[in-house]
Amino acid sequence: MTNQLTTNEGQPWADNQHSQTAGQRGPVLIQDYQLLEKLAHFNRERIPERVVHAKGAGAKGYFKVTKDMSAYTKAAVFSGVGKKTPLITRFSQVAGEAGYPDTYRDVRGFAVKFYTEEGNYDIVGNNTPVFFVNDPLKFPDFIHSQKRDPRTHARSQDMQWDFWSLSPESVHQVTILMSDRGIPASYRMMHGFGSHTFKWVNAQGEQFWVKYHFKTNQGIHNLSNELADELAGKDTDYLQNDLFDAIETGDYPSWTVAVQLVPYEDGLNYPQDIFDVTKVISQKDYPLIEIGQMVLDENPTNNFEDIQELAFSPANLVPGIEASPDKLLQGRLFGYKDAERYRLGANYEQLPVNRPKVPVHNYERDGAMAQNQATGVNYEPNSQDGPTEVPAAKIHGDQLSGTTGNFSADPDYYSAAGKLYRLLSADEQTRLIENIRMNLGQVTKPEIQIREVKQFYQADPEYGRRVATSVKLRFSSV
């Protein structure tokens, strides 16, 4: 049955093809309120795009527990073999705008929102286990360097490599980005990582450090530079279409979800800083433990409502899962929610896709587009049967000491990148060097190239020498 056309107020709409005019050839009448409403709404259809991760796609699905983890965390989402929790995901680029080609070389966002019985739990990571910077103070500058030149409004290799060459902590992530995995062939065919270290707490108060890994069950597949360039010209939404079409035809992508668990004290005494997001925890020391499967089996029914209005935050934690001292994570706990307040409004949590599946009871009221919490009391303490605190949900703090100040982090930013380079096959190393040449070779200032080659050399001398040769630098100048 065809629905009746109406205005936004529900009134029947007689003619949506012709404006009201003074005669057949006369001017449009200001009394045509339906025309005015249509134009006014059109002017307000767009919302600010995400300041990062603007281009992306998503899908709905579920997480199924395959190993009960209640010995390590009291979070209900990870307890009980066979338990299913609905979720929604979003995969994205980092730097490109909303219309940017999907096959541009970039880190990919990998975000998951679990609708648990204890509220929403978000894992907001990437398709790489590390990141470019480890201090939130540097994050805005990093993003500025990856976006458009304020004068030319063009992407700038000089800006990107200038920042990287002056930020030694970035060399590990840059190596991953310039490797084969810098251009995934499909969102379905890439791994995901929580990136940061988090804390798990069990019902007895025992604490563990945890890192999340999402291992694609479709296998890792990447694009060559040539094919990526070809697809960018033919289908700018290639990865988005690939994900949608696969799910639409019943080819549901899935990931094996695993964790690295580190006993609390062991983490504090680990040879490297496990709270530095530019580094990984060796799987030889702490092997992966499979905990479940993530399956995506439903496409968005309305992309704007399901994906554009979708909001993630690392601060969306549930009892049994807590933040760690990771500096970049600490900054993200604020930054993401503040970004959504700007992009979607003060009450973005009330949008259907962000609304938890459990009732919400608190003392926050009003604001733009608010659906208030009935007639309940709006202050605390009170004696009016308002919602009460839940002591069992308290966090388990860490013992902290030290002098306040601005501190640099671990100076060893090179060994991990060197190990990664040496783990690559000869063919993978050759493609890595060629990918760097294609990008670093476009830099117009030799001093930037020299600084970056020095970074690669400190990671591995052969690595540095090969990059220097590829961009035609005399190694003596390095």
Swiss-Prot record:
Record's keyword annotation contains Oxidoreductase: yes
* Signal sequence extent: none
Q: What is its EC number?
A: 1.11.1.6
| Places the protein is found | Cytoplasm
Against PROSITE patterns, the record matches this protein to: CATALASE_1 (PS00437), CATALASE_2 (PS00438), CATALASE_3 (PS51402)
Q: Where does heme bind?
A: Y336
What EC class does the entry list? Answer: oxidoreductase
From which domain of life does this come?
Bacteria
Q: Which keywords does this chain's UniProt record carry?
A: Cytoplasm, Heme, Hydrogen peroxide, Iron, Metal-binding, Oxidoreductase, Peroxidase
UniProt record, GO biological process: hydrogen peroxide catabolic process; response to hydrogen peroxide
Q: Which reaction does it catalyse?
A: 2 H2O2 = O2 + 2 H2O
What protein is this chain from? Catalase
